[in-house]
């Protein structure tokens, strides 16, 4: 069972130094995909091996998972993958590198903590304030992918993103993956579980305009 961590805890006010792209990756010029709430990082490990022409950055709020993922990267000598520990809201709000923003082409929020109780909705990763941060940081054309098996959470995320003027929904049927990055080449552990149990998956794609 996934351990929930309160992202509003004072423990996450301090963030680790954000390295430069050159420090994180073997080739800093590659396009960058960001996965927020990456857990142990298995999804990104698979993506990094399937598509070596991109760099992958995972942000996770559970420190032990990040430490283990970083160790695995070192042991496997993968050069296009890096992990950061902390609250994604704080980390992205602190990003000062224009190069990181220039290279960042897509972001995924896959099966985030649902925080079912209404009084805990403010702990959900996608909040109006966070989407405002992204609208100011991201370049036009940057993609956002969301995916969950919780309909209420999907509606909440979709409403929050769609109500920001700078993001437009893309019809999945009309989206040409051959012309863009496809994070659906591999599946997260949660997605595999959902598929095996024949549960519903709700997903949507947005583009910064």
UniProtKB/Swiss-Prot annotation:
S-adenosyl-L-methionine binds at residues 35, 60, 87, 113. GO terms for cellular component: tRNA methyltransferase complex. It comes from the Bacteria. It catalyses: guanosine(46) in tRNA + S-adenosyl-L-methionine = N(7)-methylguanosine(46) in tRNA + S-adenosyl-L-homocysteine. Pathway: tRNA modification; N(7)-methylguanine-tRNA biosynthesis. PROSITE patterns: SAM_MT_TRMB (PS51625). Substrate binds at residues 117, 149. CDD domains: AdoMet_MTases. InterPro entries: SAM-dependent_MTases_sf (IPR029063), tRNA_(Gua-N-7)_MeTrfase_Trmb (IPR003358), tRNA_methyltr_TrmB_bact (IPR055361). The active site is at residue 113. GO terms for molecular function: tRNA (guanine(46)-N7)-methyltransferase activity. Keywords: Methyltransferase, S-adenosyl-L-methionine, Transferase, tRNA processing. Its EC number is 2.1.1.33. Catalyzes the formation of N(7)-methylguanine at position 46 (m7G46) in tRNA. HAMAP family: tRNA_methyltr_TrmB (MF_01057). NCBIfam families: tRNA (guanosine(46)-N7)-methyltransferase TrmB. Belongs to the class I-like SAM-binding methyltransferase superfamily. TrmB family. This is tRNA (guanine-N(7)-)-methyltransferase. It comes from Prochlorococcus marinus (strain AS9601).
């Amino acid at each position: 069972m996934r351990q929930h961590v309160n992202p509003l805890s004072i423990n996450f006010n301090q963030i680790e130094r954000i390295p430069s792209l050159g420090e994180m990756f073997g080739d800093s010029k590659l396009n960058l995909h960001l996965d927020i709430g990456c857990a142990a990082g298995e999804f990104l490990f698979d993506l990094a091996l399937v598509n070596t022409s991109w760099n992958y950055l995972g942000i996770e709020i559970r420190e032990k998972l990040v430490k283990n993922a970083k160790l695995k990267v070192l042991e496997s000598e993968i050069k296009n993958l890096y992990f950061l520990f902390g609250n994604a809201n704080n980390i992205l709000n602190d990003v000062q590198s224009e190069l990181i923003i220039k290279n960042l082409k897509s972001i995924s929020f896959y099966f985030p903590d649902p925080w079912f109780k209404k009084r805990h909705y403010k702990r959900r990763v996608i909040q109006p304030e966070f989407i405002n941060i992204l609208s100011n940081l991201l370049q036009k054309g940057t993609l956002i992918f969301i995916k969950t098996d919780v309909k209420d959470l999907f509606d909440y995320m979709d409403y929050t993103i769609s109500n920001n003027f700078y993001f437009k929904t893309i019809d999945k049927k009309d989206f040409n993956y051959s012309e863009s990055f496809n994070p659906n080449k591999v599946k997260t552990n949660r997605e595999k579980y959902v598929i095996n149990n024949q549960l519903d998956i709700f997903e949507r794609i947005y583009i910064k305009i």
